Structure formats: C-alpha cells, structure tokens
Amino acid sequence: MATAASASASASPAAAFGAKTRRPGPSPSPSPSPASAFARPSPRASAAGRLHASLHLGGASATGSSIVSNASGIHLAAPVLAPLAVPKMTGAVGAHKNVLLFHCEEMRELAEQVVARNDDIELRSISWRTFADGFPNLFISNAHTIRGQHVAFLASFSSPSVIFEQLSIIYALPKLFISSFTLILPFFPTGTSERMEDEGDVATAFTLARILSNIPISRGGPSSLVIFDIHALQERFYFGDSVLPCFESGIPLLKSRLQELPDSDNITIAFPDDGAWKRFYKQLQHFPMVVCNKVREGEQRIVRIKEGDPRGRHVVIVDDLVQSGGTLIECQKVLAEHGAAKVSAYVTHGIFPNKSWEKFQPDNGEGPGHGLSHFWITDSCPLTVNAVKDRQPFEILSLAGPIASALQI
C-alpha cells in the first residue's frame, strides 16, 4: 500500500487528470526541434516555390534558384530573380539631334561654317528666284524628306526688301510636318526703334517682334528664335507666347580673342554709355572698367569719362552695334587723351550704313590718337563682312560655333 501511494503521489496532477479523460489513440507527434523550426518556409518562399514549379511545368525556366526545405522534408526550388534592367533614357542631357539647316543667300558662307562645326547639322538648299514683276518665286528642295526632322533657318534681315521673301520661307517650313523649327536671326534689325519719344512715333521693333511671334507651330510645339545681343533688354518682352526667344551673346568670342593677345594681362573694358554697361558688365566684370557718357554743351554732345582710369592700359570699347560710328570715335579720342596705351573696339553687329566703316583707320603702331589697334565684329551682318574683310583694323569673329551650339538646345 505504501509503495502504491508513493507512486501515485509522484505523478503530476495533469497526468492524473489525463489518465481519467483521454481516450486511447495514436501518440502525438513529437515537438519539432529548434533546427527544423528554423527551416520552416515562409509563405513568400512557398509561393516562390510554387511559381517556380509552375514555370518549370509550363516549359519556362528561371535564371537561377535556391533550395528551401519545409518541415515535411520536401525541397522547394525558389527562383533567384535577376535585377531589373533600367531602360536607357532618351533625350538625356548632352544628347545630339540631327538638324537640317536652310539659309538665305546672304548667309550661305556662315551656314557652311556652321555645318563644318558640327556633324549633326546638314545643309539644305532653297531656290531663290523672282517673277517678272519682282515678287519672289521660291522653292524648297526635297521638301518631302524633311518630315519629322528638326529644321532651322539662318536669316538676315539686312534690308526691308529681303524680309518678305525670307518670311515666306519661315512661315512655310513649320507646315511641312517637321518635328521642330528654329529661326536663327543673328541681328534683330529694328532693335534701335524700340520706344516712342513723341506722339506718332512707330516702334518698329515691336512690329517685327509681332510678325515673328506668329510663326506657325510645328508638330513639336512653338518655334524657337535665336538672336544675338539684342539692342534693348526690354525687347525680349515684345515677343508673344507662341514663339520661344533665345537670346545669345557674342561676348564669349571677344573674351577668347582677348586671351590670345600679347598684352592680355593689361586689358581694360570701356563702355561708351550707361546702356552698354548695363548690357555687358556682368559678362566682363573680371576686367577693369571705364564708363563713358555723353553730355550736352550748347549744341554739341561731348563724350566724357564718367568713371575708371584708362592710363597705360589697352582699352577695348564694347557695344552691341555700330552705325555711323561717331560716338565710338569720340570715345576713342577721349581715352587717348587720358593716357590709354592702345584703344581697340568690339561690336557684335557692324552695320556701317553708307560705308561709314571707312572712318576707322588702323593706328599702325603710332598710338590711339591715330586710330584703333583692333576692331572686332562678328559676321551677323554679311554685307559688312564682305566690305571690310582683309581691311585693317577690322577682324571678323565668326558666330558659327555659337550658332551650332544653339541648334542643339
């Protein structure tokens, strides 16, 4: 009895309770070990395994697989997914576009230079003829081949007589189902007529801006308009919303040329008036500067030095354009009187009506009182370029490079 009592006392209450209530049946499965519990597949791994099996049965094959075991000892092959391929970006920064370049007759030489600067630009031709009554008879060669292409036109509005025929081409090109259209007008000719000083004055700069703002839209959207060193900064607001004006400058050409001079470390920039200073001083602010202005004495307008010291320096007068050249010559004389060692000049647009370029003579090493050491102009006005080519003190800085770059914008 004592032995039976001790045995009964050693049994746990749960065991005793179970002995009374549990029915006979199969013994429970043993608890899984820590190792087998760790190997139990996650729902994601099981799904991946089923996916791999379905792909394999369907005839497809995965790029790779890993082995996963579950508690039942079944081995599942889970695919190792290859990294996603990132598609190449089209139109990324630095990408080049092929451009078909048309031009007016005056701009043939400059257009050829632009094409020589960039292999992505192709020269195209236009037949410029006239009817017996003098009106233009124009023909765009191979017009069907420019569909879907980027097209540009290099224009020169050197006189009112050529503007109409060029506008006819400018309005026709965007309608030939081209991808985009760019008008390069290096010199905006009515820029000096931008304001009214008396009732009845007509601001022809605004008139021309309105005409160019109505260039037809191409399939790619509004046309682009490239202009170099427009005379008045507010003229950029004369253009409507249907054209995208892009204002470039010829000053980088001047800066590169100045670096090539033997006395490049002795350069001072002079501005003939406050307008020129406002327009260009930010691009030339690392140079010493002289600012001139005009003052009225009786019936005469005299150029005076407003600020700066030209003494002993090679002074370069900078402006956007020159017509008769009277102000520039007066500025040259004042700088020479105040001790400038040399005087040169730069303008982006050399207009020189009535052969006024003949007023400018080279100094021939005799000093600034006798003439200019250099007179740099760009080829924005081709008729002037033909007149002053190979004549001292003139030197041509070509816009071909900047135009080629602008066509890739």
UniProtKB/Swiss-Prot annotation:
Cofactor note: Binds 1 Mg(2+) ion per subunit.
Keyword annotations from UniProtKB, A to Z: ATP-binding, Chloroplast, Kinase, Magnesium, Metal-binding, Nucleotide biosynthesis, Nucleotide-binding, Plastid, Transferase, Transit peptide
GO cellular component: chloroplast; cytoplasm; ribose phosphate diphosphokinase complex
Binding of Mg(2+), residues: 229, 231
Residue ranges of the region described as Binding of phosphoribosylpyrophosphate: 312-327
Subcellular location: Plastid, Chloroplast
Keyword field contains Repressor: no
E.C. no: 2.7.6.1
Biased composition (Low complexity): 1-16, 34-43
Gene Ontology molecular functions: ATP binding; kinase activity; magnesium ion binding; ribose phosphate diphosphokinase activity
Transit peptide start and end: 1-44
Coiled-coil region: none
UniProt family annotation: Belongs to the ribose-phosphate pyrophosphokinase family.
Alphabetized PANTHER family for the sequence: RIBOSE-PHOSPHATE DIPHOSPHOKINASE FAMILY MEMBER, RIBOSE-PHOSPHATE PYROPHOSPHOKINASE 3, CHLOROPLASTIC
This protein's name: Ribose-phosphate pyrophosphokinase 3, chloroplastic
Organism: Oryza sativa subsp. japonica
